[in-house]
Amino acid sequence: MKHVLSLVLLCIVSSAVAQKKILDHSDFDIWNRIQRQTMTSDGNFIMYSLQKGEKDSQLKIKDKNANLIFEHERSERGQFTYDSKFAVFIIKEWKDSILEMKRRKVKKNKMPMDTLGIYNLKNSALEKFAHIKSYKIPKKWSGFVAYTYDLAKKNAPKNLRKEKDS
């Protein structure tokens, strides 16, 4: 009787182990990672980037009650200003289009540049600035955002841009 009971128990345990699903590539495509989480200095808002496998990231801003306030595709490197009035972030181009351009060996100066997004937390207004190279905000002072942009792409007339590229 003891041997029969042991054999039945062994069969049940081995069948339970065999039912576990093995991870494959499709599971990694839907796997979410939270990156660069930050909180305002007054503690009323949190911001994080949600990365889904090899796809574009999403920037999400939530209030202290975990209600979604703002969500933007292709956004990353988000920061809050010191006075907790604005969220500043970079908007990237679609990863698929960038990979396609790299595959076609497009020159680096013809690749699309990033956009700076500034979201007003008080009145929910979004302002965008194109052709951004980088940006910085002060850690303990508010009211300023310093950014650099590509002057040639932003202000040059179209006929001058064509002459420079030739």
Model region roles, listed by residue range:
Residues 18-166:
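Beta-propeller folds
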Residues 1-23:
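Bacterial Sec-dependent N-terminal signal peptides
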